[in-house]
């Protein structure tokens, strides 16, 4: 793609848009701040950022974003979900059981257990929220094996096994071995830190706060062919 990719920055009212817009612009995107759901058409890339509560994101879906985002997710345009933008791909979250997400990915969003043990390096008790730098294990060239990214979250995405699959457990698979889990991180337990399915990439961490690794990821996302995302 020779010209700067025309990139929709979806405004769900969840904050941090300016930081994401700056990072995308620095990575080579032609960023369009999108506050109207009906305008989500004809873009080269779509980015759905967010920090805050699942309930607030679900309210934005009910206010008009649900249908356009589902249409985009079923299309061919590469889409990047960040933090709450990843969690909203699921139907429900323990953070707000009454709120309804997109239900595009199978499973639900769960809270980290209260007792996560101790940090193996410092011996200090691991806390919730999980806040700070963490390393990824991944086979994705976009994400980068061993790269460190910045996380701030109390909830993680737990992918559900497909009916009839041989995944362990009755209904919920070990998300770190689910085919859609593109990267794993560890905070007292292994959890899925990124999802990839077709042109969709969703990350629990914040690329815009992750310095060189985040900038590299955004550049790769903007340059990648749709099927490579």
Residues covered by each model-derived region:
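Short glycine-/small-residue-rich Rossmann-like dinucleotide-binding loops
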Residues: 14, 50-52
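N-terminal beta1-alpha1 ligand-phosphate binding loop
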Residues: 5-28, 207-208
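Cysteine-nucleophile active-site neighborhood
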Residues: 52-128
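Short acidic/histidine-rich motifs immediately flanking catalytic phosphotransfer sites
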Residues: 40-50
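Short acidic low-complexity segments
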Residues: 31-42
